[in-house]
Design a protein with these regions (language model features):
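Aromatic/histidine-rich interaction motifs
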Residues: 124-153
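N-terminal regulatory/effector-sensing and dimerization cores
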Residues: 33-133
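Short, Lys/Arg-enriched N-terminal segments with co-localized hydrophobic residues
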Residues: 1-18
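Helix-loop "lid/cap" segments that line or gate small-molecule binding pockets
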Residues: 114-118, 139, 175
Length: 209
């Protein structure tokens, strides 16, 4: 309703005027197709940021609030989320994971990959049309059921797989996500992405004053 929309607007406005949007890069140093990371402590905690890479994340253990576009959503153990390219977001973990001399550990597997991770030529093929369709959906942020057996298997094995198997597994799971997996869209249809680097730079200059 209108009250909730107004509340979200002012919360997001406060985020923009108190935090700089940081452009991050997750490009693999070894020329791999994408990055797989296993985290035991929160990364980019409370950092309002964006990156060209899509972010595909499984939170086995960890709770807090996800800010993405114009959406604010609690995250919890088991959540699986796909964030599209250049979508502003940040993960605000609960104090249990960031405060004190011995904060609790998280258990997270996260992948970062460019839209062209399997080459621009492959993406142009008719057989890869599912990727382009999924990339459009991911611009709204997608949250999947944590009890999906296929997604759970993917996240539990991807870090230990060979380089070739990683690549084929990611393509297969993205096809599944586009065609079969049930997802909740997080960002509202009316949200406009600041999709030009200059827009972010101008926003950050405004914040500096």
């Amino acid at each position: 309703n209108i009250t909730i929309l107004i509340a979200v607007f002012f919360i997001q406005l406060n985020i923009f005027v108190t935090m700089q949007i940081q452009r991050l890069s997750h490009t693999p140093a070894d020329e791999a197709a994408f990055v797989v990371r296993q985290d035991r402590s929160p990364q980019n905690h409370n950092t309002w940021h964006y990156h060209d890479e899509l972010e595909f994340i499984k939170i086995r253990k960890g709770t807090g609030s996800l800010f993405i576009g114009d959406c604010i959503r609690k995250f919890q153990d088991g959540d699986i989320i796909l964030i599209g390219s250049a979508i502003p977001h940040y993960w605000l973990f609960d104090d249990d994971y960031v405060v004190g001399p011995n904060p609790a550990q998280v258990d997270i597997t996260v992948l970062h990959f460019l839209p062209t991770f399997c080459s621009a030529g492959f993406l142009a093929l008719r057989e890869a049309s599912f990727l382009k369709a999924l990339y459009q959906k991911a611009l709204k942020g997608l949250c999947f059921e944590g009890n999906d057996p296929l997604l759970n298997t993917f996240f539990s094995t991807i870090a230990k797989s060979t380089a070739l198997r990683r690549l084929t597994s990611l393509i297969e799971v993205l096809a599944y996500v586009q065609q079969q997996a049930q997802a909740i869209m997080l960002v509202s249809p009316n949200y406009a992405i600041l999709n030009q680097i200059g827009d972010y730079d101008r926003m950050n200059r405004i914040m500096d004053f």
